[in-house]
Amino acid sequence: MTIQANVPTGDETSDEASRQTSNEASSEILETARQQVLENGVGLTQAQLEEFLRLPDEALPAALQLAHEVRLKHCGEDVEVEGIISIKTGGCPEDCHFCSQSGLFDSPVRGVWLDIPELVKAAKETAATGATEFCIVAAVRCPDIKLMNQIKFAIDRINEAVDINIACSLGMLTQRQVDQLAEWGVHRYNHNLETARSYFPEVVTTHSYEERLETCNMVKAAGMELCCGALIGMGETLEQRAELAAQLAALEPHEVPLNFLNPRPGTPLENQGIMDGKDALRAIAAFRLAMPRTVLRYAGGRELTLGDLGTREGLLGGINAVIVGNYLTTLGRPATADLSLLVELNMPIKELQKTL
């Protein structure tokens, strides 16, 4: 009886060689990140981020573990909790293709103003969750005198009613408006880059990337903390995702909220597919390794993209802040669900620290 040996075919040999090369590359970028970011506190470069984002699925657990170690070493174990509310919803003149608040699209969102007593009530409810930050948001290109006056009145009433840091997100600002917000005690200002410079014209045409940067730089110069984030999953390439992380790292914001596209009816991106959960987790780890000391916050779209299990994995993969409750035009997880998860993971909520 003749026994035939299983001789690998040419294709099998090629596949095995490819897997070995991929494993070696994965080990190399992870070891580089461990030495450069974890040990020395220096973020990955754009080229290194591209390599990291190409890690295969089997390397994802190790990547998330490394990002978690970086977060613990360079940021500590505390998790910052924030609530947000819109003082003006809808009717925005800008054409951000992902946003249902644009007045240029056939979106179901309609213009609504929130009165000051409701704003104060929301601030109290946010503080009751243990949150240290309350962000007032308006869907505008830039605030007019009426809105600025309302913001000043709202800040005064909130400060009288509850002890919480106040942040604002009011679009692009003039130097005078930046100075006013700083004088009124605004702790942090949010103005997102959203996507990479090279992809920005594909998702926004009514203003430029440079205009966004100008506001960000003025905010930093005025002494307010800059919150400047990303919206990923809009059709950008892996390379553009790395580009965005590197551009944010160069800007050095205090906080980076990570949003994942939740396609909204009536917007140009309504038919864009949902980002793969593993790609989202890879991005979370990559942004942490690009910015080892930055507050990296879970923001919109995580419920749809990651679900409950993915939310947990992200908190163990570089995230150290969350927005609790609902977002501007979409529903979030109940605050109790996120707070219970933090307790389960033994992650203490950061205590309130008034900085301004």
Swiss-Prot record:
Record region (Disordered)? 1-28
The free-text cofactor remark is: Binds 1 [4Fe-4S] cluster. The cluster is coordinated with 3 cysteines and an exchangeable S-adenosyl-L-methionine.
MF terms per GO, please?
Answer: 2 iron, 2 sulfur cluster binding; 4 iron, 4 sulfur cluster binding; biotin synthase activity; iron ion binding
Q: What is its EC number?
A: 2.8.1.6
**One GO-annotated biological process of the protein:** biotin biosynthetic process
Q: Which Gene3D superfamilies match?
A: Aldolase class I
Assembly and interaction partners: Homodimer.
User: What name does the UniProt record give this protein?
Assistant: Biotin synthase
The species is: Arthrobacter sp. (strain FB24)
Species lineage: Bacteria, Bacillati, Actinomycetota, Actinomycetes, Micrococcales
